[in-house]
Amino acid sequence: MPRSRINGNFIDKTFSIVANILLRIIPTTSGEKEAFTYYRDGMSAQSEGNYAEALQNYYEAMRLEIDPYDRSYILYNIGLIHTSNGEHTKALEYYFRALERNPFLPQAFNNMAVICHYRGEQAIRQGDSEIAEAWFDQAAEYWKQAIALTPGNYIEAQNWLKITRRFE
């Protein structure tokens, strides 16, 4: 039984119903429908914290999905899971791959900035201010890209950029 049919969450059920209706009325191939089913099941598992199951579904969706835009969201969600698991190098890789397919994902730029900022803070704790500054500079670049895509968002990042004099 597909995961979407066993999930008890009202929002997930509503999303599943709407998605199923759209899949019936929008002309798509069976491969696209199957890819979306795996993607939807991956999102459901991810929202419940079942990351291993979510990854399996996302990898299967990636195998089937051919549209670069849709693939970007699958890759982004894989990056989210790796971020949640503390696997920052892997997360960055997936965010980069998502952005290669869809450069208009401000949330990917934001998450990359957060990881770089975190690494900068780690470097400070280890007493390496030079490496910390490099990480903070990289975080600033990613936040600038996120802000350029969605100027009204990421207010905390905008404040950090101004306070640290990294905002142009």
UniProtKB/Swiss-Prot annotation:
Keyword Thylakoid found: yes
Main location: plastid
Keyword Acyltransferase carried by entry: no
Ranges: TPR repeats: 35-68, 72-105, 120-153
Entry's Gene Ontology cellular component terms: chloroplast thylakoid membrane
Stored InterPro entries: PSI_Ycf3_assembly, TPR-like_helical_dom_sf, TPR_rpt, Ycf3/AcsC/BcsC/TPR_MFPF
Reported function: Essential for the assembly of the photosystem I (PSI) complex. May act as a chaperone-like factor to guide the assembly of the PSI subunits.
Family, per entry: Belongs to the Ycf3 family.
Protein known as: Photosystem I assembly protein Ycf3
Organism expressing this protein natively: Eucalyptus globulus subsp. globulus (Tasmanian blue gum)
Gene that this sequence comes from: ycf3
